[in-house]
Amino acid sequence: MYDALAQAEHDSDAVSIVVSSSKQLLDNLYSCTNAHDSGVELIKNQQIQFVLSEDKGQAIKLINDYSPEHLLVTDTKIDIQLFTNYGSLFIGENSAVAFGDYCAGPNHTLPTNGAGKFSGGLSVHQFYKVLSTQKINDNGRNILAKTSAILAQAEGLIYHQKSATVRQ
């Protein structure tokens, strides 16, 4: 419970979502949260939300669709490969999210607002420059010219089309 509350307290735009297929667990967490003034405020502002899933599969789909910055999974036996979109994954009760915030070791510059769907946390890879280069041979030119001309025409881009057709 404190992990969800800790993330919700970052700022007024922060949202923590607790997902479980156990209504009893969610009810207990809601009651515990509601017992504190700050918890009441977080619930009122929808900064902490309790979501009941039909089963583990639905919970995993919801999590991957949401792509949280921090994902705490208490089930240590779950196949973590099922989780595909998150900033940082914390596995088991011992893995407090606050440890990752402060001192566990991995970089804490993480994707927010669902950006975990296409990006991971800051790493050395963000400092690489990827350059694209094309060198087309005569055979490739003929094939690509036809395809490019068709696509350019469909988009209504006349000069793209001409750029391709002069190479046929």
Protein language model regions, located:
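Acidic-enriched, low-complexity/disordered segments with a strong bias for Aspartate over Glutamate
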Residues: 3, 11-13, 27, 37, ...
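A broad, low-specificity signal for short, low-complexity segments enriched in glycine/proline
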Residues: 11-12, 33, 51-53, 87-91, ...
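A conserved active-site cap/scaffold subdomain adjacent to cofactor or substrate pockets
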Residues: 1-50
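C-terminal core of ALDH-fold dehydrogenases
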Residues: 64-168
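Glycine-rich, Lys/Arg-enriched anion-binding loops that position phosphate/diphosphate groups
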Residues: 36-75
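Short beta-strand-to-turn element immediately C-terminal to the catalytic PLP-Schiff-base lysine
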Residues: 18-21, 52-53, 91-92, 104
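Electropositive phosphate-/nucleotide-binding environments in soluble metabolic enzymes
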Residues: 1-2, 19, 23, 27, ...
